[in-house]
Amino acid sequence: MVSEVSRWFRISLLNLAIVAFIGVLLRYKIAFSLPFLDQHYLLHGHSHFAFAGWITQALMTLMVSYLFVSGQTSAFKKYRNLLVLNLITAYGMVISFPLQGYGFFAIVFSTLSIFVSYGFAFSFWKDLNELKDERISKWWFKGSLIFSVISSIGPFSLSYMMASDNLHEKWYLASIYFFLHFQYNGWFFFACMGLLVHRLELMGIHLDIFKKSFLYFFAACIPAYFLSVLWIPIHTIIYLIVIISALVQMYGWILFLKLIRANIEKLKINLSK
């Protein structure tokens, strides 16, 4: 299994190197002319590939390894097709976006990428339910899958506005920020926390306080979206809910830091091995 995880994770790291290289090109074009590359198109390719080819690919790999160490020994065989499909859509986007922007092939690959994420969410949720023991890490992973699916509302609403020729700047930005918020603060954050909590579980750290921390972060994630669009006129009640969600997130972090502080010596010993 180690070689399987290593193989897939090396691909993710290779994709990170590609992300970094494109980032260098983007900065190079600020000072020097590369007329055969459109800055705006290249930026789209960079961002889409960073999300799908680097972060999502890495998280999927690590989450599948979680299933493996939890007793599902055929996990990588089962998820191989989804991991390959995610790579295909990611490479498709990093090629098509710089060439045509939001053209036909770029839209096809980005749409397929969303459907791959649906497939992963559905399969992984089912496999989590097959783990009979009650682990707090399962909560975080399920939260990440929920927000991964929710985030797709952003690009689909954007596609609808473009197709109906009803594109308004505020709604355009709101759709983009919707996707970004539920990717960063939902899918990415909750998946990373799930991996961290799993590591703490393996160390034998008592994690009951993490149940509360999860509930606070999960409850605050949806209303916290409005922190990204405060320039849109919103009702005073919604504004108050947004403030409360920020405070709830802060309290969730306090609970997390209290747990880390209470187990700092055990963490030092285990992480130094």
Kindly give the residue locations of the regions a language model identified.
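Hydrophobic alpha-helical transmembrane segments of multi-pass integral membrane proteins
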Residues: M1-K273
